[in-house]
């Protein structure tokens, strides 16, 4: 059996009881470590806490391992119980859907244990979940690569009065361009996690490029950091205001606010930007 288990967003205690039972009876436990992170990141202490709480050694699975060697994990699940741990909910990334398809194609039983994810946890700010349009991803810009396909999606959402959840880039164990060119042993860039501030800077750059007045410095947004953890940060304000806020450690995400209901506005007041945020 292959168990794909959502861990939630905070720490090791956010796993569901059903998920914990599945982990404890698994012979091997992998943890996906590139589409999201728990509040402690990838620190050795954090991983040790997970292993103590779950009572199992945990193998960190980076992007290369999951996308290139998933077959080995699936083979192990033919005759054994194998757990694959995912921060948030298992289907927050297409990679995990692919894993299910491959396992079922080979006749391996799959059981999914759901949990909270950023997709529903953003509801804490008071913006109603059914009032969101398509979610977009904001990638890190480079000197030669500045993709902006998210702009048209935000434009469509705003034309319909809908809120837009922006998921911000995470770059963990990414090979350096130089090592890819050389071939042989790969060298990796240090981890990078996009901040709300960087996301807004890039969004405004794209707006300036297109000039369709989809959003601007005065557009209302909500910035989030470390959703689901005890020290989560939530601030509502204009893009210009949020660009100067210190949201602290990752992970961050951003919501561009659409048309609001009075109840939504009342909730947002609790998180309103104050000078000194």
Curated annotation (Swiss-Prot):
Entry protein name: Probable diphthine methyl ester synthase
GO aspect biological process, one term: methylation
Function: S-adenosyl-L-methionine-dependent methyltransferase that catalyzes four methylations of the modified target histidine residue in translation elongation factor 2 (EF-2), to form an intermediate called diphthine methyl ester. The four successive methylation reactions represent the second step of diphthamide biosynthesis.
Pathway assigned to this chain's UniProt record: Protein modification; peptidyl-diphthamide biosynthesis
InterPro entries in the cross-refs: 4pyrrol_Mease, 4pyrrol_Methylase_sf, 4pyrrole_Mease_sub1, 4pyrrole_Mease_sub2, Dphthn_synthase
Keyword Flavoprotein carried by entry: no
Keyword presence, S-adenosyl-L-methionine: yes
GO molecular function, one term: diphthine methyl ester synthase activity
NCBIfam families: dph5
Family: Belongs to the diphthine synthase family.
Origin superkingdom: Eukaryota
UniProt keyword annotations, A-Z: Methyltransferase, S-adenosyl-L-methionine, Transferase
Catalytic activity: 2-[(3S)-amino-3-carboxypropyl]-L-histidyl-[translation elongation factor 2] + 4 S-adenosyl-L-methionine = diphthine methyl ester-[translation elongation factor 2] + 4 S-adenosyl-L-homocysteine + 3 H(+)
Residues that bind S-adenosyl-L-methionine: 9, 89, 92, 117-118, 168, 227, 252
A Pfam cross-reference name: TP_methylase
UniProt source species: Arabidopsis thaliana
